A protein has these predicted regions:
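Long, well-structured alpha-helical subdomains associated
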Residues: 111-114, 118-119, 125-144
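Post-HEXXH active-site segment of zinc metalloproteases
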Residues: 76-80, 92-119, 123
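Surface-exposed helix-capping loop/turn segments at secondary-structure junctions
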Residues: 2, 27-35, 95-98, 132-139
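Auxiliary, metal-adjacent structural segments of Zn-dependent hydrolase domains
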Residues: 2-57, 127
Length: 144
């Protein structure tokens, strides 16, 4: 069971929370743990990243940037970044990614972008976005 809180200035907070829940349930259909998920929409993330995720199996904190290097992200780009970070949330909640360990093996120094946890997140972000964006936002956007 996921308890989702959306913080920061973002339109359609209830829809964003529903979107998060749908993505997480798709990634972890058998999850029975109670997990608090806090999603913060911030002006920008450290190192100009589009998003960041950290936490443990009981609480996940996700930051989503509204801009990077002075350029604003579209709402859709923010939701794709959110999908990417929700994959990392799944990895943390299930114990696949745990501090300096990936699936129980120590993480050696390697390029983060080619790490298995990033490759999984990049491979799923657009699929998850396409699967849940219209369902979660079409009516909200039409009537805003």
């Amino acid at each position: 069971m996921f308890f989702i809180e959306i913080l920061g200035k973002v339109k359609h907070k209830d829809n964003v929370a529903n979107f998060c829940e749908n993505v997480l349930l798709d990634l972890m259909p058998k999850n029975r743990k109670e997990v608090d998920v806090v999603v913060k929409f911030v002006t920008q993330c450290d190192d100009q990243e589009s998003g960041y995720c950290y936490g443990d199996q009981e609480e996940i904190i996700i930051s989503i940037a509204k801009k990077s290097l002075g350029e604003a992200y579209s709402f859709e780009e923010q939701m794709i970044a959110l999908c990417h970070e929700l994959v990392h949330a799944k990895q943390i909640i299930t114990g696949e990614l745990d501090g300096n360990y990936w699936k129980g093996e120590p993480i050696t120094s390697r390029s983060v972008l080619t790490s298995p946890w990033e490759l999984e997140a990049f491979s799923l972000e657009k699929t998850l976005f396409e699967k849940f964006y219209k369902v979660s936002f079409d009516s909200a956007i039409l009537f805003s």
